[in-house]
Swiss-Prot record:
Name of the coding gene: mpeV
Gene Ontology cellular-component terms listed: phycobilisome
Function summary: An enzyme involved in the biosynthesis of bilin.
Protein name: Bilin biosynthesis protein MpeV
Organism: Synechococcus sp. (strain WH8020)
UniProtKB keywords: Antenna complex, Phycobilisome
One Gene Ontology molecular-function label: oxidoreductase activity
SUPFAM superfamilies reported for this sequence: ARM repeat (SSF48371)
Length: 301
């Protein structure tokens, strides 16, 4: 596939100014000297355009120097970088522009980052655009959550969005907590995963209510995910009680995950309930997991 076909609505692509190999070398050396001397880089439009042209150079080290230089220029370079990311006919330039925006962390770039994420057919551009959104932090949470419910978002893009939310984590906790009441189960699931993505946040006292409420979510996938998370809780007594109640869940996947977490927590007090369920369970996979858990827990009795 040619570069010009990498962006939806490819008629809108633009040809970025190019530098000859010699021009790129001279500019790169000049930028290196300025930065080494502590001299602020030129931030006029002509200088920025030259550095952006350098993002299309075939030599990776030179591209990196131009990207770092644009990152040093900062917000003044954002409009031109966004334009290059959205409209360049060179995929190398679009990729480099998106990666460079990660260095600047400017919330004003969010609309263009969302557009590149949705419309550019190149997966590297998509990933770099999402990386730039993650670097921005809290202000990017709502746009990222909105992408989860976008009708054209692919499974790969959903994975990238979930990664970004987990990366933002505590920095976006207020917005993520508000998302727990969303009518969209995909958004609720992403918010829970982001808020509990690290062991310290998972075990924070304020997240107990989150996990308790999520254990009763209408979406069985969320309940199953919570059952797995409970197996990593440090407050094992609290987690065990919730997991034992989950053993009566109508969804077999929730029951299976609850049994596995109880086994992980060495919940010997759950043995009577597990033995009772073994006789009643109809799902063959859950029965096998029950047998394994009962055997393991009896060995530690």
């Amino acid at each position: 596939m040619s570069d010009s076909n990498q962006i939806k609505n490819s008629s809108q692509t633009q040809q970025v100014n190019t530098l000859s190999e010699e021009e790129a070398l001279v500019l790169s050396a000049h930028l290196k000297e300025q930065r080494s001397s502590g001299i602020p880089l030129d931030s006029d439009q002509k200088s920025i355009d030259k550095m952006i042209a350098g993002l299309g150079d075939p030599r990776g080290l030179l591209r990196l120097r131009f990207a770092d230089s644009l990152g040093s220029v900062g917000q003044a370079a954002v409009p031109a970088l966004c334009n290059a990311m959205l409209s360049s006919d060179q995929v190398t330039v679009r990729r480099a522009a998106a990666k460079t925006l990660t260095l600047i962390e400017d919330p004003n770039s969010l609309p263009d980052l969302v557009s590149a994420f949705l419309n550019d057919q190149d997966s590297v551009v998509q990933g770099s655009a999402m990386g730039a959104m993650a670097a921005i932090g809290e202000e990017a949470v709502t746009p990222i959550l909105n992408l989860l419910s976008h009708p054209e978002t692919t499974e790969m893009q959903i994975g990238l969005a979930n990664w970004a939310l987990a990366f933002i984590g505590d920095r976006g906790s207020k917005t993520l907590r508000n998302a727990l009441s969303s009518g969209n189960s995909t958004i609720r699931k992403a918010a829970i995963a982001a808020l509990t993505s690290r062991i310290d946040t998972l075990n924070a006292d304020e997240n107990k209510d989150l996990l308790s409420n999520a254990s009763n979510d209408d979406d069985s996938e969320i309940r199953a995910e919570v059952a797995t998370l409970l197996g990593a809780m440090e407050d094992t007594d609290w987690a065990k009680l919730l997991l034992i109640s989950n053993l009566d869940d109508p969804d077999s996947w929730v029951r299976k995950n609850s049994v596995l977490s109880l086994m992980k927590l060495n919940a010997k007090e759950a043995l009577p309930k597990l033995e009772e369920l073994e006789l009643q369970e109809k799902d063959r996979i859950v029965v096998n997991v029950l047998k394994l858990a009962i055997q393991k827990l009896r060995q530690t009795d």
